[in-house]
Amino acid sequence: MHDIRAIRETPAAFDAALALRGLSAASADILAIDEARRAAITQAETAQADRNAASKEVGKAKASGDEAEFERLRALVSTKKDEIARLDEEAKAKDAELTAILEALPNLPSPDVPAGADEDDNVEQHRRGTPRAFDFKPLEHFDIPGIAASMDFETAAKLSGARFVTLKGAVARVHRALAQFMLDTHTEENGLTEINAPVLVRDETMYGTGQLPKFAEDSYQTTNGWWLIPTSEVTLTSLDSGNIVDEATLPHRYAAHSLCFRSEAGSAGRDTAGMLRQHQFEKVEMVSVTHPDQSNAEQQRMLACAEGILDKLEIPYRTVLLCAGDMGFGATRTYDIEAWLPGQDTYREISSVSTCGAFQARRMNARFKPSDGGKPEFVHTLNGSGLAVGRCLIAVLENGQNADGSVTLPAALHPWLGGKTRITAEGNLA
């Protein structure tokens, strides 16, 4: 949600930032509604003052025996009451109209975010690791002989339809180990607090992080009204919803491993083979709630935490700064980490690390009390994948594949696999 005071003060800058998002100017319409709302409130306050003054005079007129003045004042009190009710309704209607516009507009890009329309305009920051030189043509994950039998799309389609997978045996074990490895790293080495939260949430929870109302079609809703979370960013960020916390307690750093559910409404025909884009998947998510002065540094810290997972797994990757047109709805700055997938001969997104400024905090009324005793202020919220488990599994399998159909697993993962080091061409851990 946007700060109406900031729009009043710098409408041209607001419109310029929207233009970077590919949107038309909106400040004139917003300020016209805001002015009408404020005028109705002012008029209602004036009418209330007039009514109060007239009410005080009614008794005096009655006591003096001035019947005509008494009736005039009584009629005035009644008229003002009706006027106040009308103006209150007008103010409420304008407030609802204003909220409807503001809640549909995305966050504004940070000044250091590059201009651009889509992923072609993103700016690479750095690359880490060197893609392996194979002496055979590397396969995509679902075609690797040691993997194919344990990654069952046919059975999943029978159970649930397209964009689902059933993992079996060694592959299921590696998938589980990856999630545990990520979560343990973030909690034991990176200082995040592990959270196990619901995957079913209320409208208000989805609204607070910006999923509703704009992206309702991208999510799943149960028949009794709960929403299945598209990411545990929703629940982790909402832990501080409606709270006023002491400044000294910040930052709050959370991590969770959860199921995630997405309809992929806008992805028809994209990534239909394999498990790169699924309706149900698992992710280890990081969320930080910070003092505004610390949010930029915190984003760099979170980025390092996510990159550190790939460093440990020895998976080559690159990090890009997203342009304004490619950022998510709630972000003011986003870095994508893209893992090298030799089967596709390209880098693919495996994590997004975003700072949202006060955008989400304003929607969910999450604030902190300054240590100097000042008025409560909105916190800043940040989120990042640490990492997407299924996509990380793909990267591990494709980068570790061998000519005989087996897969060599990263050394960092061995302790979570009981010392096993590879998946054989027959699909067994060894």
Curated annotation (Swiss-Prot):
It catalyses: tRNA(Ser) + L-serine + ATP = L-seryl-tRNA(Ser) + AMP + diphosphate + H(+); tRNA(Sec) + L-serine + ATP = L-seryl-tRNA(Sec) + AMP + diphosphate + H(+). One of its GO terms (biological process) is selenocysteine biosynthetic process. Keywords: Aminoacyl-tRNA synthetase, ATP-binding, Cytoplasm, Ligase, Nucleotide-binding, Protein biosynthesis. One of its GO terms (molecular function) is ATP binding. It is an enzyme of class 6 (ligase). Its EC number is 6.1.1.11. ATP binds at R262, S263, E264, E349, I350, S351, S352. The keyword ATP-binding applies. The keyword Aminoacyl-tRNA synthetase applies. One of its GO terms (cellular component) is cytoplasm. It is found in: Cytoplasm. Pfam families: Seryl_tRNA_N, tRNA-synt_2b. InterPro entries: aa-tRNA-synt_IIb, aa-tRNA-synth_II, aa-tRNA-synth_II/BPL/LPL, Ser-tRNA-ligase_type_1, Ser-tRNA-synth_1_N, SerRS_1_N_sf, SerRS_core, tRNA-bd_arm. L-serine binds at T231, S232, E233, E285, S385. Pathway: Aminoacyl-tRNA biosynthesis; selenocysteinyl-tRNA(Sec) biosynthesis; L-seryl-tRNA(Sec) from L-serine and tRNA(Sec): step 1/1. Consists of two distinct domains, a catalytic core and a N-terminal extension that is involved in tRNA binding. Belongs to the class-II aminoacyl-tRNA synthetase family. Type-1 seryl-tRNA synthetase subfamily. Homodimer. The tRNA molecule binds across the dimer. Catalyzes the attachment of serine to tRNA(Ser). Is also able to aminoacylate tRNA(Sec) with serine, to form the misacylated tRNA L-seryl-tRNA(Sec), which will be further converted into selenocysteinyl-tRNA(Sec). This is Serine--tRNA ligase. It comes from Jannaschia sp. (strain CCS1).
